[in-house]
Amino acid sequence: MRILITGAHGFVGKNLVAALENIQNGCDRTRGTLAVTELMLYDKESDPAALADYCARADFVFHLAGVNRPTDTAEFKVGNTDLTATLLHALEAAGNTCPVVLASSVQATLTGRFTGSAYGESKRAAEVLCFSYAERTGAKALVYRFPNLFGKWCRPNYNSAVATFCHNIANDLPITVSDPAIRLELAYIDDLIEEMIAALSGGEHRLADGFCTVPVTHSVTLGEITDLLYTFAAQPTTLVMPEMAEGSFAKKLYSTYLSYLPARKVAYPLTVNVDARGSFTELIKTANCGQFSVNVSKPGITKGQHWHHSKWELFIVVAGEALIRQRRIDDSEVIEHRVSGKTPTAVAMLPGYTHSIVNLSDTEELVTLMWANECFDKNRPDTFFKEVDPCN
């Protein structure tokens, strides 16, 4: 399939091109029989003469190009309405009735706060052209009225509050929130791209009024957005990873936020607690799913020798050789597991069992990844000394 993308260097365009290139070069093998043979990219820097050639050869058109922040409102018509007319004329002149996706905007409804919007009017006119073209030629028109968009590569301080908030908070810059209660309808860029790829195979989501839609959107307030972003920004300090359900706005916003991090923030130090036996470092904490840590034991060292009422843990040795021993505190039987980083094994530390881990090497350190079902609370540690050896 030969695909023409106008506005290829814009926010949506860059993400769509990246996704289609993955299909084209075989990196994305999840798309069944969908084949991309050529991507014809057209943007404001392109030679206008190339558009006619692309329109003659295209099997599918994504018309994403447009103007949304001009210095002169007259540019809305030129960049949105007139360019659409030029594109459709080139297709019709070539006798090419391939499907055409038009990226319009919710502002084209011209209702509510969008009443009288010059941008919305120019997009509305482009919609009319597209539907008329489809009726006249029999070509398939897929007109999407996109809501506010967010995701990686969106330009900050331009046309997206989310992009600006992410950029500023990631770079320790102030933000301005006029009213935290203002609610936005947002579509995540990856959800939008999934819909675009579905449209390539005839799987678009179409509404009763003839418009197409991105089926997954999120309704959130400015206050909710900024609260989440400040929580994300604090994570390297608190170590607390926020809960992010699959498909949730929080999960998508966190991915977006991370894409704005400056290089100096990509890595951050952890607190290493060192003693004569080795070290212990907390890695990640969660609100309801415990915490992850890494424990380093020096050669020949035994750690642990304690038990818990309700807390339980998983030990996974990732480097070295260890003997993990545990005993129910009211019994004499000792359960032993010899484990190695060469064959990682998860060993559960059971509630009511005192346990220890011994570094069996005389020369090498033992490195153990540990997960506990709850975060450590110094006021209620639920940790009590007792040696595993029942003779002691």
Per-range role (PLM):
Residues 328-352:
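Short acidic-glycine-tyrosine-enriched beta hairpin
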Residues 191, 198-271:
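Mid/C-terminal beta-alpha module of Rossmann-like enzyme folds, strongest
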Residues 266-305:
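A short glycine-rich, His/Asp/Glu-containing loop-to-beta-strand
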Residues 156-164, 181-201, 222-227:
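Substrate-positioning beta->alpha
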Residues 85-127, 134-137, 142-144:
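Conserved Rossmann-fold NAD(P)-dependent oxidoreductase catalytic core, especially the SDR/UDP-sugar
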Residues 128-156, 167, 173-179, 211:
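Conserved beta-loop-beta element that borders a ligand/cofactor-binding pocket
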Residues 1-26:
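N-terminal Rossmann NAD(P)H-binding glycine-rich loop of SDR-like oxidoreductase domains
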Residues 44-86, 90-94, 107-114:
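NAD(P)H-binding glycine-rich loop region in Rossmannoid oxidoreductase-like domains
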